[in-house]
């Protein structure tokens, strides 16, 4: 499977706290941002650098900077918004693209209702963020949209993934690397990840869970 599990002690500790059933909205939101920051750190590890000359306090010096166009972060609405601030803490100059996809609870297929992409996607690295990679439909649809708009370099950062969803994404887009805190056991009959986190969107936004 084309997936990187970030097995850092801080990542695993925060994931464990997120899994608690009685975690408050405030705490869940805070932990989501913290975990997103740590996962994004790993996802940006292979960014290409270039040397540039700057004016330092002691004169001109050579330093390293990320080469080429900056990143676009792509939250999948609505739950992906909960991870956005954590990623922007690391790459504050990143442009933000947005994809709105809702899951049909009967067919489990994604339905697009909003798309807004920044310019020059062909020159940017896109980092898709979504707390859960369950069936894989939303992630595949988002990657499809990005590629259709010219994006060539795409990564996906999720907190928890199911094997079924990872396979769907790998089969459709083998060039896209997935980063996750955990590869969980399976999907249940309703398409939810087991053990998972529950409904991450409801927990982040404080809305009623079914």
Swiss-Prot record:
Q: What does this protein do?
A: Catalyzes the conversion of uracil and 5-phospho-alpha-D-ribose 1-diphosphate (PRPP) to UMP and diphosphate.
* Name listed for the protein in its UniProt record: Uracil phosphoribosyltransferase
Q: What class of enzyme is it?
A: transferase
Family, according to the entry, reads as follows: Belongs to the UPRTase family.
User: What EC number(s) does this enzyme carry?
Assistant: 2.4.2.9
Entry binding sites for 5-phospho-alpha-D-ribose 1-diphosphate: 78, 103, 130-138, 199
The UniProt entry, under NCBIfam families, shows: PRK00129.1, upp
One Gene Ontology BP term is: UMP salvage
Q: What is the lineage of its organism?
A: Bacteria, Pseudomonadati, Pseudomonadota, Betaproteobacteria, Neisseriales
Which residues does the annotation say bind uracil? 193, 198-200
Disulfide partners: none
The gene coding this protein: upp
Family matches, as Gene3D superfamilies: 3.40.50.2020
Q: Which InterPro entries match?
A: PRibTrfase_dom, PRTase-like, Upp_B, UPRTase/APRTase, Ura_phspho_trans
Q: Which UniProt keywords apply?
A: Allosteric enzyme, Glycosyltransferase, GTP-binding, Magnesium, Nucleotide-binding, Transferase
Q: Which cofactor does it need?
A: Mg(2+)
Q: Which GO terms describe its molecular function?
A: GTP binding; magnesium ion binding; uracil phosphoribosyltransferase activity
Task: Give the record's cofactor note, including how many are bound.
Answer: Binds 1 Mg(2+) ion per subunit. The magnesium is bound as Mg-PRPP.
> What does the record say about activity regulation?
Allosterically activated by GTP.
| Record CDD domains | PRTases_typeI
Catalytic function, reaction form? UMP + diphosphate = 5-phospho-alpha-D-ribose 1-diphosphate + uracil
Q: In which pathway does it act?
A: Pyrimidine metabolism; UMP biosynthesis via salvage pathway; UMP from uracil: step 1/1
Source species: Chromobacterium violaceum (strain ATCC 12472 / DSM 30191 / JCM 1249 / CCUG 213 / NBRC 12614 / NCIMB 9131 / NCTC 9757 / MK)
